[in-house]
Curated annotation (Swiss-Prot):
Role: Catalyzes the reaction of cyanate with bicarbonate to produce ammonia and carbon dioxide.
Active site annotation, chain numbering: 88, 91, 114
Record protein name field: Cyanate hydratase
Keywords, alphabetical: Lyase
Source organism: Prochlorococcus marinus (strain NATL1A)
Catalytic reactions on record: cyanate + hydrogencarbonate + 3 H(+) = NH4(+) + 2 CO2
Enzyme kind, highest EC tier: lyase
Gene3D superfamilies: Cyanate lyase, C-terminal domain (3.30.1160.10), lambda repressor-like DNA-binding domains (1.10.260.40)
Name of the gene encoding the protein in the UniProt record: cynS
GO terms for MF: cyanate hydratase activity; DNA binding
Similarity comment text for this entry: Belongs to the cyanase family.
């Protein structure tokens, strides 16, 4: 998978500064997953957020526009992912997507979970049998309307 030049530049600067997405999130007052989505061109920063980020990473203001312009979301390659970690999420949806859809619709009715009015958090859960990854998604329910 190839990434835009802006993504590569941001990731390189982050690595050179020895920062994590969590470190940058604290600086900006935003969640680490949202910050990562900004790096990958899937979110839009405010002018203030872009200025803080660019200053922290030691990058010039010529990169501000790419951070503050609304992106084409979901614009990653439309093929089945090959990265093992990302593929697991694809696999999870293949196995549990329809069951999740049915359970959500039993509880809420006919509609969807928003990915706009939405948060996602990633946590580490220590376990003697092997640490666990806990992914929590919280999206507003949007019922389909009748007309």
């Amino acid at each position: 998978m190839s990434f835009p030049e802006s993504t590569q530049l941001l990731l390189k600067a982050k690595k050179e500064k020895g920062l994590t997405f969590a470190d940058i999130g604290i600086l900006l007052g935003l969640d680490e997953v949202w910050v990562a989505s900004l790096f990958y061109g899937q979110s839009t920063a405010s002018d203030e957020e872009a200025d803080k980020l660019l200053t922290t990473l030691g990058l010039g203001t010529e990169h501000k526009e790419i951070l503050t312009t609304p992106p084409v979301k979901g614009s990653l390659d439309p093929v089945i992912p090959t990265d093992p970690l990302i593929y697991r999420f694809y696999e999870i949806m293949q196995v549990y997507g329809m069951p999740m859809k049915d359970v959500i619709q039993e509880k809420f009715g006919d509609g969807i979970m928003s990915a706009i009015d939405f948060t996602i958090n990633v946590d580490k859960v220590e376990d003697p049998k092997g640490d666990r990854v806990k992914v929590s998604m919280c999206g507003k329910f949007l019922p389909y309307k009748k007309w």
